[in-house]
């Protein structure tokens, strides 16, 4: 009815486009819920690699012909379409996991960075006289902040429109160890991991620095040193960030379960 009686063709077109995107997102989220519900015991006992989750979601979309075009007769091979939508679904849930309406916030999913190994977290906890579970929770959140920023890539080629949908910009997001306040000033796509340093030598606090200071009861210099150490030893360690050149990095989904 809206499309029939709208005073503006532009508004009608926007509404139709919005409803199509919203329905596609609903189908993707429903697919994730179905796969998790069917496999939750196995996933809890043996956390799945992101690639495996995408494969299972692809199979579900394929078997249901979820993204078939209107008039589909059931003969067209939809695997490529199913796989693209599976990747969009998973990337979207990872990047938006802190939203109150995300499947992670609803307790259906949880993404874990593989670099925060138990022995590393135990060492940090001992060094700073903290509980291991508190340290693990802190660094799990800090690693996910890179994902929330959007410095994340999966094993798929995304169009500009798809990137806009997931990351809110077609330009790939990136992160670096420490942003240069002059050279990187206009790079809105780029996040700094540790605090930037002002010309007078003082630190420009970011959210990560404040969080480390609060949880571990550290002064800003010690907290920033720990962030830089974590970058060097963990984020650039065995489960490393991937390089995009120019000292800019991103997470591959291979680093998560």
Language model regions located:
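Charged, low-complexity interaction segments
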Residues: 1-257
């Amino acid at each position: 009815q809206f499309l029939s009686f709208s005073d503006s063709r532009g508004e009608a077109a926007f509404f139709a486009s919005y409803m199509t995107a919203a329905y596609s997102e609903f189908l993707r989220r429903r697919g994730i819920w179905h796969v998790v519900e069917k496999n939750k015991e196995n996933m809890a006992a043996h956390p799945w690699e992101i690639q495996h989750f995408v494969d299972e979601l692809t199979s579900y979309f394929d078997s249901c012909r979820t993204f078939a075009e209107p008039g589909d007769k059931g003969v067209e091979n939809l695997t490529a379409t199913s796989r693209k939508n599976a990747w969009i679904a998973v990337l979207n849930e990872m990047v938006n996991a802190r939203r109150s309406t995300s499947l992670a916030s609803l307790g259906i999913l949880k993404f874990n960075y593989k670099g925060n190994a138990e022995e590393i977290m135990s060492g940090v906890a001992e060094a700073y006289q903290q509980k291991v579970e508190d340290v693990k929770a802190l660094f799990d959140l800090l690693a996910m902040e890179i994902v929330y920023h959007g410095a994340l890539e999966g094993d798929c080629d995304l169009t500009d429109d798809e990137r806009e949908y997931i990351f809110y910009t077609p330009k790939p997001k990136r992160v670096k160890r420490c942003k240069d306040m002059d050279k990187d000033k206009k790079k809105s796509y780029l996040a700094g991991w540790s605090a930037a340093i002002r010309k007078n030598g003082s630190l420009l606090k970011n959210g990560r620095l404040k969080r480390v200071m609060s949880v571990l009861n550290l002064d800003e210099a010690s907290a920033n040193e720990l962030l830089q150490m974590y970058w060097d030893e963990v984020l650039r360690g065995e489960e490393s960030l991937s390089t995009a050149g120019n000292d800019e990095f991103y997470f591959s989904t291979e680093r998560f379960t």
